[in-house]
A protein has these predicted regions:
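Short, acidic Ser/Thr/Gly-rich low-complexity loop/linker segments typical of extracellular
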Residues: 39-43, 49-67, 131-162
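Surface-exposed loops/turns
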Residues: 60, 69-70, 93, 163-165, ...
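Structured interaction patches on ligand/partner-binding surfaces of diverse proteins
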Residues: 80-98, 151-154, 159, 175-193
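Terminal accessory/anchoring regions of large secretory-pathway or extracellular enzymes
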Residues: 1-58
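Catalytic cores of extracellular degradative/oxidative enzymes
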Residues: 174-176, 180, 205-336
Length: 336
């Protein structure tokens, strides 16, 4: 069987397991180190055979061990802020290869971002390449710590690896704070220090900034991690965000506490009751642990019944909130 038929990206370790199961595989062990002999664990390693590529990642010790089908493999090792490494490997059935690879010293930016009082603040930074420097792609768009050309942080002290070049930085924390722009040059193999304070120019005593409709992985319709979602909200200066995952009553408070964001954002347990028609948010709701969906009600077609079920739910506070999302005026509000 041709395990690599056609252009595709496969799970690297699964490929090795299948190759061994079929009886033809060679072993490979790669170790990545920087000039100080410290492990490089943040790299991506692409293996190409013909027109097919598989990707792997080293562990925290900078090691990647796997099996590969026999053949002439091209290997490309890349990491933000380091030069790419290219090598060729001839994998033979029943034989093992060991390689130690030395990567360049990493370049990037170290941030110290504060509020006006000097305390650390959640924030977002966007990197825009200028004068021929390409804008970076730091990762998938639903990840806080490196998403496309942005980085969202739960605190003001953080580092971002960047390839050498010239960048415009835009530091923000939502619409109530002034943004800060800086242009920097990142030298090869060095980190640049950036310090800045974000001024809150819009005063809102007695009011809080809220977002009543958010989701993360437990909702089942997206792959944004819960911690990533909360970091994103805090970086945009959302001060209150009820927990509104699809069809289950959840409380984000433990995540907020683990991230150290108690002073920046708060939540209460709730849910979005969801089906093939109207969607409704409700909070607060008390989770009923060890019950299906933590005791959430079941969705029905009639939006009036859903609203009543949420309002009358045993865990719903009498002064709580129920609203309908993205309403269809004909389906949901027509006279009956």
């Amino acid at each position: 069987a041709d395990l690599l038929a056609g252009p595709q990206v496969l799970h690297l370790h699964a490929l090795g397991v299948v190759a061994r199961k079929l009886g033809k595989a060679g072993g490979l062990s790669l170790t990545l180190r920087d000039p100080d002999e410290k492990p490089v664990s943040s790299a991506s390693i692409d293996f190409t055979l013909g027109d097919s590529t598989v990707r792997g990642y080293p562990d925290q010790d900078g090691k990647l061990e796997l099996g590969l089908p026999p053949g002439s493999w091209k290997v490309s090792v890349s990491d933000h802020g380091r030069a790419r490494l290219e090598l060729s490997l001839e994998v033979e059935d029943g034989k093992s290869i060991r390689r130690e690879l030395a990567m360049d010293r990493q370049s990037g930016v170290r941030f110290s971002v504060t509020k006006q009082d000097g305390s650390s603040t959640p924030c977002k930074v966007q990197f825009i390449g200028v004068e021929g420097t390409p804008s970076p792609n730091l990762g998938p768009g639903d990840r806080a710590h490196g998403c496309k050309d942005q980085y969202h942080s739960e605190k003001g002290n953080f580092s971002v690896a960047l390839d050498p070049g010239k960048y415009k930085l835009i530091l923000t924390r939502g619409i109530e704070h002034d943004h800060v722009e800086k242009t920097i040059t990142v030298p090869k193999g060095q980190y640049v220090e950036v310090k800045s304070a974000l001024k809150r120019s819009v005063k809102t005593p007695g009011w809080v900034s809220t977002d009543f409709h958010n989701h993360s992985t437990p909702s089942g319709d997206n792959v944004c991690g819960t911690a990533d979602r909360l970091i994103n909200l805090a970086a945009e200066h959302i001060e209150f965000a009820p927990t509104t995952e699809h069809n289950r009553i959840i409380d984000w408070t433990p995540y907020i506490e683990r991230l150290g964001l108690q002073g920046e954002i708060s939540t209460i347990p709730g849910m979005e009751l969801t089906g093939s028609g109207p969607h409704l948010n409700a909070f607060p709701l008390t989770p009923k642990h060890h019950h299906q969906d933590n005791g959430a009600p079941q969705w029905v077609k009639d939006p009036r019944i859903n609203a009543l079920n949420l309002r009358n739910h045993p865990g719903h506070h009498p002064s709580g909130w129920v609203h309908i999302n993205h309403p269809d005026m004909i389906e949901n509000f027509v006279d009956r």
